[in-house]
Amino acid sequence: MARKAHITVGVGCDFLGDAAFGCPYSEATLELERLCVAGYTPMEVITMATKVNARLLQMEDQLGTLETGKLADVLLVDGKPDEDIRVLRRSDHVKLVIQDGRIVKNAMPHTAKA
């Protein structure tokens, strides 16, 4: 409905899950998946979660896109979330996380140096 009415939609979830009840951290990605089920493309949903959210927060000069001078948290996944958003749900697909300029997860395969 929001899409047909050209309403700007951001992404956000206060519930990150509770492992004690079988809800992993990836529960937050459920919203992304539901937006795809509602008719948005995976790339539209990724844009909502990044660029659109920055605009809604009036912080697009600081966040939302990877550009020189902007703050950046970076997520590198094994898969193509722009084609299948579900790859973001699986922690084993998350290979590299950079937060506030620091690597907080590095599951990249290491290659030997010649």
Spans of model-derived segments:
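His/Asp/Glu-enriched, well-ordered alpha-helical/loop segment
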Residues: M1-K80
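C-terminal cap of metal-dependent C-N hydrolases
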Residues: R55, T68-K113
